[in-house]
């Protein structure tokens, strides 16, 4: 059964400044959810909390499989992943960078090779699999981050500003990758972006972050 996510009354403050103010929403359908809003509206914070990278000050973050609540343990964390803008790179090949998530999960060599090659093909980087990742452009690095996430075949994928600071050509490529993922039903995807036009192009469900709350558009 596919994962569902319910957040209820989520609050978060930094140094006494509220960022999230009683956020509640159910991410229960497949497709692409897009969180929009101005810089500092809490989009990235909400993604980190949903991806279990940070904990809320108050409120609940609950994952379901069917009607069953799932423990927030390592098994759940292996079913979700967050891609940040400007991913960290290792001084090794594109292939090894894309394989990182699988390797730390103990993936077998042949299965890892198959999944990584498929992910690199999907994002258009298979021809650079043996290149050093440090030679990639910023747009290619962002695509590599998506490939690294895709290789582990997450059931829920979080993308934080996936086209921030990349050129128009790579922005179009990344958007097409997301649309193709949606077409194939690969993951339930939750994206944070300040670009309203991009939100309209990608989203099945558009959500506005305003004063630390989620408003369905």
Describe the role of every protein-language-model region.
Residues 157-160:
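Catalytic Walker B motif of ABC-type/P-loop ATPase nucleotide-binding domains
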Residues 51:
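Helix-to-loop junction immediately C-terminal to a conserved catalytic motif
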């Amino acid at each position: 059964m596919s994962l569902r996510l319910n957040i209820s009354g989520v609050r978060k403050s930094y140094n006494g400044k509220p960022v999230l103010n009683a956020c509640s929403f159910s991410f229960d359908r497949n497709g692409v959810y897009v969180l929009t809003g101005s810089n500092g509206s809490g989009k990235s914070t909400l993604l980190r909390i949903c991806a279990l990278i940070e904990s809320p000050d108050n409120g609940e973050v609950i994952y379901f499989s069917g009607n069953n609540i799932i423990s927030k343990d390592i098994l759940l964390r292996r079913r979700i992943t967050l891609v940040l803008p400007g991913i960290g790179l290792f001084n090794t090949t594109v292939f090894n960078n894309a394989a990182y998530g699988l390797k730390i999960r103990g993936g077998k060599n042949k299965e890892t090779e198959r999944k990584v090659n498929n992910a690199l093909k999907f994002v258009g980087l298979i021809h650079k699999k043996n290149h050093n990742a440090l030679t990639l452009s910023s747009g290619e690095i962002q695509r590599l981050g998506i490939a690294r996430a895709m290789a582990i075949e997450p059931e829920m994928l979080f993308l934080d500003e996936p086209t921030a600071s990349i050129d128009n050509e790579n922005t179009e490529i990344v958007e097409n990758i997301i649309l193709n993922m949606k077409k194939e039903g690969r993951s339930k995807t939750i994206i944070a972006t300040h670009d309203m036009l991009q939100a309209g192009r990608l989203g099945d469900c558009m959500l506005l972050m305003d004063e630390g709350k989620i408003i369905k558009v």
